[in-house]
Amino acid sequence: MFMINLFLLIIPILLAMAFLTLAERKILGYMQLRKGPNVVGPHGMIQPFADAMKLFIKEPLRPLTSSSSLYTIAPTLALTIALVTWIPLPLPYPLINMNMGLLFILATSSLAVYSILWSGWASNSKYALIGALRAVAQTISYEFTLAIILLSLLLMNGSFTLSTLITTQEYLWLIIPSWPLAMMWFISTLAETNRAPFDLTEGESELVSGFNVEYAAGPFALFFMAEYTNIIMMNALTTTLFLGALYNLHMPETYTTSFAIKTLLLTILFLWVRASYPRFRYDQLMHLLWKNFLPLTLALCMWYVSLPVLASCIPPQA
């Protein structure tokens, strides 16, 4: 039964990821006053499957100087970690109801750095290595703010379990009392998933293609799939944390519908940001975190810690 549930979780995620690639090309196309893919199938709807077929039937080339084992493992590890991160998410019921679901997500998203680092180092290319080192520095840096923002939300939630966030937000979304955290969280998720304007790891002008420059065919497709799966996962987590969906015990499908719509809107916002903003310079990227986000998130975390203590000093009102 567990394996059936696992496949029922993985298959829709992969389908959503496939159509996200199409949605991105369509949205970018319309924002640049062109059509986007419109040949393969009605309105280009079968384009993702054509792309997948083309990539997976090509011969996967491997550089002679590369480290074969790590070079081969890295793409598979990237996609596996991206899919494993979905396990504790309530949709409205998680695959495994973990007591420390948020810590699990934070830990698995940290592991994604290893696949990028291994791919950059094992490729034995200076462009790939620089891209990988950039990705590691960027991801580790922005995980500081993500962790502190999560800690602040947990103080309001009172539990590490994601399912309790549904109950916490029954009457009020957490985005309303903590909108500065929500803004910093959204920008940090852009950096965490290496998306524009923080896609320094794939800087075409200086690094050709970044950490995956030596990859082709199937292994390249696995990295591509991992990136887009992470985007949907981060937006799903944002919805769970800040935009708690309506939950009815007798009609759980209302939660799923509301959850899917909010996640879709956040994902479109990701694509809109990519179409609108130029890439940050690397020093600006680091200054944004260490000089702006980190002090702000620490101050807000202290505020949320001290608020219950201050409130307890107020005498009861008649």
Curated annotation (Swiss-Prot):
Q: Which UniProt keywords apply?
A: Electron transport, Membrane, Mitochondrion, Mitochondrion inner membrane, NAD, Respiratory chain, Translocase, Transmembrane, Transmembrane helix, Transport, Ubiquinone
* Reactions catalysed according to its record: a ubiquinone + NADH + 5 H(+)(in) = a ubiquinol + NAD(+) + 4 H(+)(out)
State a single Pfam family of this protein: NADHdh
* Topology with respect to the bilayer: Multi-pass membrane protein
Q: What does the record give as EC number?
A: 7.1.1.2
Q: Which residues form a coiled coil?
A: none
PANTHER family from the xrefs? NADH DEHYDROGENASE SUBUNIT 1, NADH-UBIQUINONE OXIDOREDUCTASE CHAIN 1
Q: What is this protein called?
A: NADH-ubiquinone oxidoreductase chain 1
Its encoding gene is what?
Answer: MT-ND1
